Amino acid sequence: MLTRLFNPLYCLLACLVLIGAQSAYAQSSNSPWVEFGQLSNSDVYVRENSIERVGDYLKIWVLYNYHNTRTSPSDEAYRSAITLFQFDCQDNKSQKLNSYGHEEAMGKGRQIDLLEKNPPWIELPPNSIGMHLIEAYCLSPMTNTKNL
């Protein structure tokens, strides 16, 4: 076992796997934001290139650019928030999987943790941004499908 760890080919393979994983993360985090809509207090963008479908569920990164500064539960000011939502296409529900505020617009500046513990599934009201995301992407052939 110890000789395998120091085998140059094994080390090269391990490095390539790590570089590939880092590259995939960087690619998804550098995908362009596409404007999706507007709310009374924010402009909403999605990262279309990183939408994933797993069965009846979608994972979508959403960016909110707030018109006014907001305050986090830890009393830190932020101007934008990036949230990974999971959407249930059958039951029209959403759940936050990850959420960060940023001091500047478009997810720039210092990152502030906004995710609550054990975020609940939320029923999406008609005409909400979440419902529009389901309508736009649940039936879309553009979404990346993963079979698990």
Role assignments for model-derived ranges:
Residues M1-C11:
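Bacterial N-terminal signal peptides that target proteins for export
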Residues Y10-G20:
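Bacterial N-terminal signal peptides
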Residues S23-L148:
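N-terminal secretory-pathway/extracellular module detecting exported/lumenal segments
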